[in-house]
């Protein structure tokens, strides 16, 4: 079994959150579906990715609305309400003409 999510889209919002003893950043991205609906239009989804620790700090520091990103991560089901959330583990983005990549374990490639 393998739990893997990969999303490509545009940053809509970067929102830091604080819960008791835990800080994370919710990254909202807009993803356009690669096919047309019955009306012949492309639909767009806004998805929230939760980034913890070092990854969350760098996402908050470096990503802005309109930035193109690719996010690799996993789904996690909440014990409280049973809903699934996306947990970010690797974020790639273009900044100042260069590609940047950030891992949840603190590795950063430029």
Language model features with spans:
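Single-stranded nucleic acid-binding surfaces, predominantly the OB-fold ssDNA-binding core
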Residues: 1-110
């Amino acid at each position: 079994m393998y739990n893997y999510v990969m999303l490509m889209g545009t940053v809509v919002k970067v929102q830091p959150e604080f819960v008791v003893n835990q800080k994370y950043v919710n990254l909202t991205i807009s993803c356009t579906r690669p096919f047309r609906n019955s009306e012949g239009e492309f639909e767009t989804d806004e998805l929230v990715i939760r980034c913890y620790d070092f990854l969350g700090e760098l996402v908050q520091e470096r990503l802005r609305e309109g930035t193109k990103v690719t996010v690799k991560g996993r789904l996690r089901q909440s014990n409280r309400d049973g809903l699934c959330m996306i947990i970010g583990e690797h974020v790639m983005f273009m900044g100042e003409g260069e590609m940047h990549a950030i891992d949840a374990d603190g590795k950063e490639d430029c």
